[in-house]
């Protein structure tokens, strides 16, 4: 079995097959159009690759499994406290046709891909994925999982602008992200503004296909604190992509604004992925509930020695692919 990059024709063939797994609420044609549009986005056009496991070299023969990789900037803290920049990759859309499952094809694909990524850059740090099928499959390829908790807040009526200094629009994303503090963690991946806009592009696509309005803001600012978020239409959620708050009062103001934006957009709730400092910021916010996440389990495989355990790595929702 061989690892190879997919051609454009092979990508389109996989789109038709993977609709069953990820095309909920869309027709096959709509899903295929969504995939082509997302691949054309500047972030994915620059750093996304589609990989195949095939029976013959150079993509020949039957396709046994497929996945996608997305490039991320990552940072490893040195013993002296400086940040060493590197390259990491997020893996998504791991797929094997039902008729080919149970034969270890996905595990073989992940093992070959990890070996390739180890030599893809002299600055290689890690491969990351967000599993919807538990941890066991990917543990066999050297991945280790982190605990995954969400803070869930119901959408509520009210003026989103009343409790914050500003509501943010798409054009504010890059400036807002640039002003956010980097984590104090020993290792972390950091999204680009283009990656966050990719989340908003998904929002735009579903708003168009479902004929529904987009939320009236994609974030908010309260003093020096800020948050960025995006709609996930098929689950009626507003997901917080990035949150940088210094105090509980700031976090509460930003999340209340998100809940009010969600209500006005016809969404049911706000979801914030827990990071190491999240409980101290969010506890005490009326209506907020901490729940175990049922999908998108963060998992990490080091591509070099010296990385800390996955439990010490923060995973904001903005990194999800």
Where do the protein language model's features map onto the residues?
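Active-site rim helix/loop that mediates acceptor-substrate recognition in acyltransferases
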Residues: 17-81, 182-219
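GNAT/GCN5-related N-acetyltransferase fold signature
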Residues: 53, 69, 96, 229-232
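Glycine-rich phosphate/pyrophosphate-binding loop shared by adenosine-nucleotide-utilizing enzymes
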Residues: 59-67, 89, 223-228, 236-238
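A conserved beta-turn-beta hairpin within the catalytic core of GNAT-like acetyltransferases
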Residues: 73-90, 101, 232-241
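Conserved acetyl-CoA-binding loop-helix of GNAT-fold acetyltransferases
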Residues: 93-98, 102-117, 248-261
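Conserved hydrophobic beta-strand within the GNAT/NAT acetyltransferase core sheet
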Residues: 94-96, 125-131, 270-272
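Active-site/acyl-donor-binding loops of N-acyltransferases
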Residues: 130, 136-160, 230-321
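Amide-forming acyltransferase catalytic core, primarily the GNAT-like/NAT-type
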Residues: 147-242
